[in-house]
UniProtKB/Swiss-Prot annotation:
Protein keywords: Isomerase
Function of the molecule: Catalyzes the reversible conversion of ribose-5-phosphate to ribulose 5-phosphate.
Family: Belongs to the ribose 5-phosphate isomerase family.
Residues the record marks as active site: 105 (proton acceptor)
This protein's pathway: Carbohydrate degradation; pentose phosphate pathway; D-ribose 5-phosphate from D-ribulose 5-phosphate (non-oxidative stage): step 1/1
Native organism taxonomy: Bacteria, Pseudomonadati, Pseudomonadota, Alphaproteobacteria, Hyphomicrobiales
Summary of subunit composition and partner proteins: Homodimer.
Keyword Isomerase belongs to the record: yes
NCBIfam families listed in its UniProt record: PRK00702.1, rpiA
Enzyme class: isomerase
Protein name per the record: Ribose-5-phosphate isomerase A
Length: 232
């Protein structure tokens, strides 16, 4: 089975948790895109839901698939968010943001009663850090922000390259919110929760890709089927 087929399998399983009348957070990325497409099929069959997209790309996908949309300006709470992840550890802490939508993804996840993360089995890791950690920053004062982040890394017992994310044309990648992203190549992160707490107050840091305590359920697709892991 191809990797894409595994992602779609995980998305289909998550769809079983969607009920009529739900307010849904719609994630960003290749796996979340499968969920949006399958949700659109259910909507065409009569399912009544409304979704809040976590990126402009997801908004476009949802509109193409006929999924009704709203915003968190109109809803202050969501029933369920379904999103992918770049890494998932045994406590269901996540690394997210490979697609650049980490800020909106975290806002939507935090506004949800439940978050289901869907992925293929390669995203399951013993500890976070193998995938570069995205850190969304304001372009102003970039050197000072970089220095502050590096100091925090030393305090958290990690180190590694901190690189501005680039587009294929060599220019800086710009998020939907108009920010830039540092990708931190750290290797193993000894304590992801501790690092997250140190990054949060840095002036210039808008958000980071450590999602601590937000996911309730992970659905991991592999050659032998779907493995469901619930947060301990």
């Amino acid at each position: 089975m191809t990797m894409d087929a595994l992602k779609r399998q995980a998305a289909a399983r998550a769809l079983e948790y969607v009920e009529d009348g739900m307010r849904l957070g719609l994630g960003t990325g290749s796996t979340a895109k499968h969920f949006v497409e399958l949700l659109g099929e259910r909507v065409r069959d009569g399912l009544k839901v409304v979704g809040v997209p976590t990126s402009e790309a997801t908004r476009a996908d949802a509109e193409r698939c006929g999924v009704p949309l709203t915003t968190l300006d109109d809803l202050d709470r969501l029933d369920l968010t379904v999103d992918g992840a770049d890494e998932i550890d045994p406590d269901l802490n996540l690394t997210k943001g490979g697609g650049g939508a980490l800020l909106r993804e975290k806002i939507v996840a935090a506004a949800s009663d439940r978050m289901i993360v869907i992925a293929d089995e390669t995203k399951w890791v013993a500890g976070l850090g193998r995938f570069p950690l995205p850190i969304e920053v304001i372009p102003f004062g970039l050197a000072a922000t970089r220095r502050a982040i590096t100091e925090v890394f030393a305090k958290a017992g990690v180190s590694g390259e901190l690189a501005v994310r680039k587009r294929p044309d060599g220019h800086a990648f710009v998020t939907d919110g108009g920010h830039w992203i540092f990708d931190a190549h750290l290797g193993q992160i000894p304590d992801a929760s501790y690092l997250a707490g140190l990054l949060n107050p840095i002036p210039g840091v808008v958000e980071h890709g450590l999602f601590i305590g937000l996911a309730r359920v992970a659905m991991l697709a592999g050659a032998e089927g779907i493995r469901i892991v619930e947060r301990r």
